């Protein structure tokens, strides 16, 4: 934000600008954030007697990291190194964002707003396989959902790893990574590219030996992923990947940013089919999207009522009354973290626990910078 009056300086999705100019009073900054110009500096401030331009710059992000082309920023100067914080979820993040030595090609984002709290979408993608055969029944009825059918969601595992969690589908038995990826519609060239970047004991073992295909996931707090493979025509399925951010506007409204992702070196025909599959299912007009949002808006609306304040919702799926899990950890799951087969709300509880821990943590005691003056304040 501009150091003058706090206006947002950059409002474009992408570009190649060499400078950034605040639209309010035209203060201008170089691409490295340093202040380049102040209109009427002499007349308005008496030059450096009123405001020293030298050495002024936009506030830098305290912590920044890049993985697979994605930029992650923390505003906490005491945040641990990103890879340390990401932990075991790095394994699953690579499925969605590292499928080729050429990198991933993104389209978007689509942006729209929903009258729902941001945490509902985040926790849904983290582990709610239970809703699929019910909320998305209409999608099944028209034949959009190919194999595996939604009622087989209970055969997949729910995993928790580091600050993230996700869902999987169980693949037909006896396959390897190539047959598993062909089963969900991947082109042979795309499979070869993925094998070139995935170590044999990593994702190929999860898909091949364990027989699980990653589906939806969330990285705390508000970054989600979805991988699905609907029918595009005559029984032929096409896989797609979507990356999405749940950006809070307020407690009752969320801006959704949704990107389509595909291997950059994939054949043009595969990219076209994959994008078509994405648009059918997700994005502002996707059929899955519309089903989900109707639920989330209703939950947010009823949560405002007096009756909702009297109710402690039950989020104990997968637990006995004494708090022990109904099923143990899956014995031969090739991915890192904790994995349990069947329905449960283990992942939602994990995500909300991380959120509660973040709220309890005191904010860092940082000095306030006084721009243009020779002092900082606490």
Feature map (PLM): residue ranges:
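Rieske [2Fe-2S] iron-sulfur-binding domain
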Residues: 1-77, 81-91
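C-terminal catalytic domain of Rieske-type non-heme iron oxygenases
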Residues: 62-66, 70-378
């Amino acid at each position: 934000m501009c150091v003058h009056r706090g206006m947002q300086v950059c409002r474009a999705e992408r570009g190649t600008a060499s400078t950034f100019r605040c639209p309010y009073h035209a203060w201008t900054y170089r691409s490295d954030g340093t202040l380049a110009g102040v209109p009427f500096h002499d007349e308005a401030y008496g030059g450096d007697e009123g405001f020293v331009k030298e050495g002024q710059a936009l506030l830098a992000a305290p912590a920044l990291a890049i993985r697979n082309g994605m930029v992650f920023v923390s505003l906490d100067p005491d945040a641990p190194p990103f890879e340390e914080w990401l932990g075991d979820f790095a394994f699953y993040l690579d499925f969605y964002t590292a499928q080729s030595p050429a990198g991933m090609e993104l389209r978007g984002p689509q942006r729209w707003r929903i009258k729902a709290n941001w945490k509902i979408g985040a926790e849904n993608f983290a582990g709610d396989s239970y809703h699929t055969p019910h909320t998305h029944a209409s999608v099944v009825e028209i034949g959009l959902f190919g194999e595996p059918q939604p009622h087989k969601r209970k055969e997949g595992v729910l995993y928790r790893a580091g600050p993230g969690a996700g869902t999987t589908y169980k693949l037909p038995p006896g396959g390897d990574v190539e047959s598993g990826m062909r089963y969900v519609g991947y082109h042979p060239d795309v499979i070869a590219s993925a094998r070139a970047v995935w170590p044999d004991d990593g994702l190929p073992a999860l898909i091949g030996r364990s027989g699980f295909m990653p589906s939806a996931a969330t990285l705390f707090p508000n970054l989600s992923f979805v991988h699905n493979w609907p029918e595009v025509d005559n029984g032929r399925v096409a896989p797609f990947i979507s990356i999405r951010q749940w950006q809070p506007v307020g407690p009752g409204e969320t801006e959704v940013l949704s990107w389509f992702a595909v291997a950059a070196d994939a054949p043009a025909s595969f990219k076209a089919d994959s994008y078509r599959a994405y648009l059918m299912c997700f994005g502002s007009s996707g059929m899955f999207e519309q089903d989900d949002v109707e639920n989330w808006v209703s939950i947010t609306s009823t949560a405002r009522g007096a009756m909702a304040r009297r109710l402690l919702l039950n989020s104990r799926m997968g637990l006995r009354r004494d708090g022990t899990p109904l099923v143990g950890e899956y014995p031969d799951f090739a991915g890192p973290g904790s994995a349990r087969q069947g329905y449960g709300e283990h992942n939602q509880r994990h995500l909300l626990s991380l959120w509660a821990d973040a709220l309890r943590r005191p904010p860092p005691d940082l000095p306030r910078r006084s721009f243009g003056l020779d002092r900082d304040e606490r």
